Design a protein with these regions (language model features):
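Conserved NAD+-utilizing ADP-ribose enzyme module
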Residues: 1-89
Length: 89
């Protein structure tokens, strides 16, 4: 699996703010292509974020999120994720 982080700061995990609740949700991508595509879309949205893709064990990142009560979403090849207006790390 893959996540997005701040470039050279893997502890700065990228998250999306859910509009209705304000919850931060970490997208966890099953496929590198989907992660790359999303990162490109973010850069084209002129977010001023310098992101990098990190390959990570899915069980590890899911467990880390659950341990911290951090919401997450598994992005499969069948999902379409488009960057929202409110991007947060």
């Amino acid at each position: 699996s893959y996540i997005l982080t701040l470039k050279d700061k893997p502890e700065g995990v990228f998250s999306i703010i859910e509009k209705e609740t304000g919850d931060h949700i970490v997208p966890i991508f099953d496929e590198l292509d989907d992660c790359e595509r999303y990162a490109i879309q973010l850069s084209e949205a002129e977010t001023d974020l310098t992101l990098q893709m990190i390959e990570i064990d899915k069980e590890f990142i899911v467990s880390a999120c659950e341990d911290r009560d951090q919401k997450y979403a598994i992005i499969t090849p069948d999902d379409l994720l488009i960057p929202p207006d409110n991007v947060v790390l």
